[in-house]
C-alpha cells in the first residue's frame, strides 16, 4: 500500500481546461473544493457536499472507480485545494481524477463574456463583483 501512495503522489497532476469541462459536464462527476461558506454559486452539474460524500463512498465500497471520471475545481487558478483532493483520491485508488485549473473564477469570467447558456452556474452568478473569486495578491506582501 505504501508504494501505491508513493506512486499517487509522484504522478504529475492531470489538468484540463474549460473546453473539457463544457464537453464532459454530465459525463463526469463534477466536484468543487470550495469551503462550505462559498457553495452558493457553483458550476452547473456540481455534486453538492452530500452527493459528493455518497459518490466517493460508493466508489470505495463498490470498487467502481472506473465507472465515472471525476473533475475537480477550486476557487481560481491559484487554489491548491483541487490538487490536494486529487492526491487524496489517487491515494485511495481512484484513478480518473482531473483538475480544472481555471476554477470558478475563470468559469464566471467566461460566463460574463459568453453567457450563462455556454457557462451555466447554479445561481447564475448574480454577483456584481466577480473579483471576489480572484486569487489573493501575494507579491505585494513580499516586496
Can you say where each PLM-predicted feature lies in the sequence?
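Flexible, polar/low-complexity N-terminal or interdomain linker segments that lie immediately upstream
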Residues: 1-41, 116-143
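Catalytic cysteine-centered active loop of the rhodanese-like fold, especially the PTP/DSP P-loop
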Residues: 58-108
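Short acidic active-site motifs
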Residues: 20, 54-59
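Structural motif
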Residues: 33-35, 51, 75-76
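Short active-site oxyanion
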Residues: 24-30, 44-45, 69, 95-96
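Active-site regions of enzymes building and remodeling cell-envelope glycoconjugates
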Residues: 42-51
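Glycine-rich, charge-decorated loop segments at or immediately adjacent to ligand/cofactor-binding or catalytic sites
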Residues: 107-117
Amino acid at each position: 500500500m505504501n508504494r501505491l501512495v508513493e506512486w499517487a503522489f509522484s504522478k504529475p497532476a492531470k489538468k484540463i481546461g474549460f473546453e473539457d469541462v463544457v464537453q464532459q459536464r454530465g459525463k463526469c462527476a463534477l466536484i468543487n473544493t470550495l469551503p462550505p461558506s462559498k457553495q452558493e454559486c457553483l458550476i452547473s452539474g456540481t455534486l453538492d457536499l452530500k452527493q459528493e460524500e455518497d459518490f466517493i463512498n460508493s466508489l470505495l465500497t463498490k470498487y467502481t472507480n472506473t465507472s465515472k471520471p471525476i473533475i475537480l475545481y477550486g476557487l481560481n487558478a491559484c487554489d491548491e485545494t483541487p490538487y490536494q483532493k486529487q492526491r487524496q483520491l489517487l491515494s485511495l485508488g481512484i484513478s480518473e481524477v482531473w483538475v480544472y485549473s481555471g476554477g470558478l473564477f475563470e468559469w464566471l469570467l467566461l460566463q460574463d463574456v459568453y453567457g450563462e447558456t455556454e457557462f451555466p452556474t447554479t445561481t447564475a452568478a448574480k454577483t456584481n463583483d466577480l473579483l471576489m473569486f480572484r486569487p489573493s495578491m501575494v507579491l505585494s506582501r513580499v516586496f
